[in-house]
UniProtKB/Swiss-Prot annotation:
The family this protein is said to belong to: Belongs to the glycosyltransferase 2 family.
InterPro entries: Glyco_trans_2-like, Nucleotide-diphossugar_trans
Enzyme Commission number(s) of this protein: 2.4.-.-
GO molecular function: glycosyltransferase activity; hexosyltransferase activity
GO terms of biological process kind: biosynthetic process
Domain of life: Bacteria
Name used for this protein in its record: Uncharacterized glycosyltransferase MG025
Organism from which the protein derives: Mycoplasma genitalium (strain ATCC 33530 / DSM 19775 / NCTC 10195 / G37)
Signal peptide: none
Length: 298
């Protein structure tokens, strides 16, 4: 029996009571699509008053559900939803509680149902005076036929819609480990047959929120060690572009130098996300800049 929900929105939240209201209000802005959307708020052991903030929404809207679990980081929330088979929508997306959708984004996405994934562009909020429009892929709106082009560094969960079937096929994620959204995205790309790219802004990603994985210092051993592990897996997934771009982040490179560590990869990274001329130039430049810190068989 088909689900009555077109969409499921999973909202992982940890100590984000001051942001989650904006995330929920953005779902109300989906107008007629809001009531066709299942909303799953999963409180990952917050120590703030998140439950009180969302209580009015739970009373007013029957399509919004709230769950509490012990803290296990982002990946544990996705595992929790899958294990308990909570997500019922035809398409499933993850909205971090400090991000939000733009008005009528779901209406735009629904026009392209039928693909394994539908992926949109989004805005990156930096501060009150600066917002950047991020386009995950090169090219125009349409089906992406070359799946190597999907190995984008923009693997944030924002504006990515997984078919229900694909979502439940994905590997379980590691708990208590940063950057599991990268693995979720690239795992999905390994499995998809059809991906539609909507080159329109659908949402806003709050990249600079204090305390998130992006702004946490690279001196944090949990973040640093997690990223070393993630880079190994990105290479196995063929996402060499991710390896080089993030290795070049000043804080990460500084820690590699400080710890005198070398990333040993099983093969040379690929840069297939880029157009061929750029891939050649970028690959050569990055290989030179990281030659002391990334090694692979000749």
């Amino acid at each position: 029996m088909p689900s009555k929900y077109l969409f499921t929105v999973i909202i992982p939240t940890y100590n984000c009571c001051q942001y989650i209201k904006k995330a929920l209000d953005s779902l109300l802005l989906q107008n007629e699509y809001f009531l066709k959307t299942q909303v799953l708020i999963v409180n990952d052991g917050s120590l703030d008053n998140t439950k009180e903030v969302v209580s009015d929404y739970l009373i007013k809207y029957s399509n919004i559900s709230y769950f509490e679990k012990t803290n296990g980081n982002w990946g544990s929330v996705i595992n929790y939803v899958k294990k308990n088979k909570l997500a019922l929508g035809q398409y499933i997306t993850v909205l971090d509680s400090d991000d939000y959708f733009l008005k009528d984004s779901f209406k735009k996405v629904a026009r392209f149902f039928g693909h394994d994934m539908i992926i949109g562009a989004f805005y990156c909020y930096i501060n009150e005076n600066k917002t950047r429009f991020l386009k995950p892929y090169f090219g125009k709106t349409g089906v992406i036929k070359e799946h190597t082009k999907l190995r984008t560094p923009h693997s944030q969960p924002i504006a990515k819609f997984y078919s229900n079937k694909l979502f439940y096929e994905l590997h379980d994620l590691k708990e208590k480990l940063f950057f599991q959204d990268c693995l979720m995205y690239h795992d999905a790309i390994n499995r998809v047959e059809s991906v539609f790219y909507l080159r329109e802004p659908l949402a806003v990603w709050f990249s600079t929120r204090p305390g998130n994985s992006t702004t946490t210092s690279w001196e944090n051993p949990n973040k640093f060690n997690a990223w070393c592990e993630i880079l190994q897996k990105m290479n196995l997934y063929g996402a060499g572009i991710v390896i080089y771009i993030y290795t070049m982040l000043p804080g990460f490179l500084k820690q590699l130098k400080k710890k005198q560590l070398i990333l040993n990869l099983n093969h040379k990274p690929a840069y297939t996300w880029l157009p061929k001329p750029l891939a050649f130039i970028f690959g050569g430049l990055m290989a030179f800049k990281t030659r002391k810190y990334i090694k692979y068989p000749k």
